[in-house]
Amino acid sequence: MSGGGPIYIHKMSADGTRLLDDGQKVYEGPVAEGTKLFKKDGYYYISIPEGGVGSGWQTVMRSKDIYGPYESKRVLEMGVTKVNGPHQGALVDTPEGEWWFYHFQSADPQGRVVHLQPVVWEDGFPVIGMDYDKNEVGEPMKVCKKPSIECNVTPHAPQSSDDFASDKLALQWQFNHNPANENWSL
């Protein structure tokens, strides 16, 4: 699959190292990027973040045939929340059978803040987050339960202060993109 605008499905070599055809266009929409393809219950699903980071939404399409035709549904948008974008995420399922959608929002100097939203399936499409404004499109939840997974990880609060005693920056000093190391020192 490829495309940052139109979405194409390609045949690939068995080892996944090269394309074997020019691809078949299966969708064209506004600023489609970060597309994901998966199969569930006999359907091919294409998850597409559309419309750009600031005001975008998440579309999910499904078809019994990988080349379509596809049914399309907007499944997540900013709506009445303050989470812009909900953008460039992915649907994931846990070993316990729960479904989740992780995505980011653009938070200017804080960079791209990651969110995790609960998912339920209704009529063959994911319902992501909560439909606060009752328009049949999910919206990001500010607070939700955490995934019910078996895990032996001790939770840690984020570090919020630094005495700069180390020769390396602590985790709270992560950079939005590529750090300009020449602009700081310890």
Put a short name on every predicted segment:
Residues 1-186:
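Carbohydrate-active catalytic/glycan-binding domains of CAZyme proteins
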